[in-house]
């Protein structure tokens, strides 16, 4: 499922391709690209739930809003988000790329993924997807994109 999300993000969203694609055509394109129907369905459902945030149909869990409070992760969250992932989320909060609300959206979307393996690079892409879909997060998206590609470009040299 995560592979489908990455493909969709890179092919349609990140490249600013036509965003209004017929769902049947999209499913057929993904099938033609070699993705499993169940993974396609799950990825589209995942994106639909993300769109609910954008449309105000869903809100992230509201936790303490005191900026000095510390987020305590549940065992399920710790299982999916290792120490490097949790540290990266904290770092992004400290440099104000994400706020308490977007952090909770990211965590909720990460937990909704049906993938056995999840690492820091995967988290960065989920954060990009969430920020892209939330109105008013354009600057945060830009900062996150710069962080993601700056680090990856540095690895190539």
Curated annotation (Swiss-Prot):
It comes from the Bacteria. Pfam families: DUF494. Belongs to the Smg family. HAMAP family: Smg. This is Protein Smg. The gene is smg.
């Amino acid at each position: 499922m995560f592979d489908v999300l990455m493909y969709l993000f890179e092919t349609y969203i990140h490249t600013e391709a036509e965003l209004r694609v017929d769902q049947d055509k999209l499913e057929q394109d993904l099938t033609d690209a070699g993705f499993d129907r169940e993974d396609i369905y799950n990825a589209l459902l995942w994106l639909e739930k993300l769109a609910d945030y954008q449309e105000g149909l869903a809100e992230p869990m509201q936790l303490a809003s005191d900026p000095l409070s510390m987020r305590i992760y549940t065992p399920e969250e710790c299982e999916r988000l290792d120490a490097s992932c949790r540290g990266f989320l904290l770092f992004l909060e400290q440099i104000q790329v994400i706020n308490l609300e977007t952090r909770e959206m990211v965590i909720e979307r990460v937990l909704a993924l049906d993938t056995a393996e999840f690492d820091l690079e995967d988290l960065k892409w989920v954060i990009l997807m969430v920020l892209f879909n939330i109105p008013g997060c354009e600057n945060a998206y830009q900062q996150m994109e710069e962080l993601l590609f700056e680090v990856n470009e540095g690895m190539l040299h």
